[in-house]
Amino acid sequence: MKKILIPVSIIAILLCASWKEDAKTVSPDRLFLADSGKSLFVTNRAGNELIKMSSDGQKAEQKVTLSSPVNAMTQDPSGNLWVVCDGNTGMMYELDGKKLSVQSKTKSGATPSDILYSPVSKSLWVTQRFNNELW
């Protein structure tokens, strides 16, 4: 398996450089891999966005704006991405893995902090940070 290591500072610089002039604030926060490590995603906390980077990490290819900042992401076997967002409008989103279009959304309270797909139980697990809950 080939490892690709891209320092976060380089991604932040490239993300800022590739951003359109009408964007006001870019705040790279979290990194996620999908498609067995072939797809790189970075979050823009200030813009409530999930951004798919090019495979070499040099430019932003796609983005989706969500209700609040992305805390975590996982992928199911069909390629759909599952994302939890925190804040007053905390949500769990199901996204089409290719188009980044929203397939479904579920209110999840204000504090979803992580999400994981379990291939054994074929289910999603979500933690609620301050509520001491595991869904």
Protein language model features and the residues they cover:
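Positively charged n-region of N-terminal signal peptides that target proteins for export
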Residues: M1-I4
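Short helix-onset patch at the extreme N-terminus, typifying the N->h transition
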Residues: I6-S9
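Predominantly soluble domains enriched in secretory-pathway, periplasmic, or organellar proteins
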Residues: A12-W135
